Swiss-Prot record:
It comes from Nitrosomonas europaea (strain ATCC 19718 / CIP 103999 / KCTC 2705 / NBRC 14298). This is Cytochrome c551 peroxidase. It catalyses: 2 Fe(II)-[cytochrome c] + H2O2 + 2 H(+) = 2 Fe(III)-[cytochrome c] + 2 H2O. The lineage of its organism: Bacteria, Pseudomonadati, Pseudomonadota, Betaproteobacteria, Nitrosomonadales. The gene is ccp. InterPro entries: Cyt_c-like_dom, Cyt_c-like_dom_sf, Cytochrome_c_Peroxidase/MauG, Di-haem_cyt_c_peroxidsae, MauG/Cytc_peroxidase. Heme c 2 binds at C209, C212, H213, M284.
């Protein structure tokens, strides 16, 4: 009995030391692992999922949140700039919605303080979904099934843009991607990364990339000028934070993007100017770090970046309520 108790105690100590060692390892790194989340309000998240996928929030009845932030494609659309109402070219590359709850603000220029505020923007943007908040409210309120869900979640069946965006934001907060190879390495699995991936991470750290790309999202927590050492050449007119603040000092200052799932979210940069990860790494080295990475270094950094791809959101697609005679009709050609 004493021997068995001693064995169990030693095993417990061994496991405790192992988990403590993994915790210390992660704590000593500039990047932290992502943890799975449970929605604060599961019913609200389910309602938000329905609204996220509902194209009737747009004037055309064709564009939904998922059109530009496709959850089957890394939470983005893989084109330079998104396509809006009547095939209008969007002004800027669509950032991924995955792990977006970790951002200090939303949009490349940070003009929305949170996901709720961000969700309201595209609905009424004439170059995106091109509807109005009032029409979006009428569309949703026209369907009894939606009103029933609003009553269950909010206590009454009143449909407002505030409630619509609150629900969408709650769903988006669930879109995190834990379980990447790099997270497993951070958590103590020394075999999770191969030699090239590990050397790539050391290059990533040693070159200064982690000064901006750090934390659980590997970015998203700060702003930085695009073109610190050398100007970034682009035809895109976006001026970054200056478009929000009006301060010349904020010209070409953008929110640092997350690098989680980066292999899925091409093309890269606010203008979609880098078609491949290799091109993005080369450009960042040159204009942000004043460093010319050689081919082998680029290859190893890219190998590391691909270890940041986590478990993608896995859920059942919503069945949307049917429109009825009271539902405002789409106007795709107007």
């Amino acid at each position: 009995m004493i021997k068995r108790t001693l064995t169990v105690s030693l095993l417990s100590l061994s496991l405790g030391a192992m988990f403590a060692s993994a915790g210390v390892m992660a704590a000593n790194e500039p990047i932290q692992p992502i943890k799975a989340v449970t929605p604060e309000n599961a019913d609200m998240a389910e309602l938000g999922k329905m609204l996220f996928f509902d194209p009737r929030l747009s004037k055309s009845g064709f564009i939904s949140c998922n059109s530009c932030h496709n959850l089957s494609m890394g939470g983005t659309d893989n084109i330079t700039t998104s396509i809006g109402h009547k095939w209008q070219q969007g002004p800027i590359n669509a950032p991924t919605v995955l792990n977006s709850s970790m951002n200090l603000a939303q949009f490349w220029d940070g003009r929305a303080k949170d996901l709720k505020e961000q969700a309201a923007g595209p609905i009424a943007n004439p170059k995106e979904m091109a509807s109005t908040h009032e029409i979006a409210e009428k569309v949703v309120a026209s369907m009894p099934q939606y009103r029933e869900r609003f009553k269950k979640v909010f206590g009454s069946d009143e449909v407002t843009i505030d409630r619509i965006t609150t629900a969408i934001a709650q769903f988006e907060e669930t879109l995190v991607t834990p379980g990447s190879k790099f997270d497993k390495w951070l958590e103590g699995d020394k075999n999770a990364l191969n030699q090239d991936e590990l050397e790539g991470y050391n290059l990533f750290k040693g070159s200064g990339c982690v000064q901006c790309h750090n934390g659980p999202a590997v970015g998203g927590s700060s702003y930085q000028k695009m073109g610190v050492f050398k100007p970034y050449e682009t035809k895109n007119p976006a001026a970054g934070r200056m478009d929000v603040t009006g301060n010349e000092a904020d010209r070409n200052v953008f929110k640092v993007p997350t690098l989680r799932n980066i292999e899925l979210t091409y093309p890269y940069f606010h203008d979609g100017g880098a078609a491949t990860l290799e091109q993005a790494v080369e450009t960042m080295g040159r204009i942000q770090l004043n460093r010319e990475f050689n081919k082998d270094e680029v290859s190893k950094i890219v190998a590391f970046l691909k270890t940041l791809t986590g478990d993608q959101p896995d859920f059942k697609l919503p069945i949307l309520p049917p429109s009825n005679n009271d539902t405002p009709r789409s106007q795709p050609y107007e």
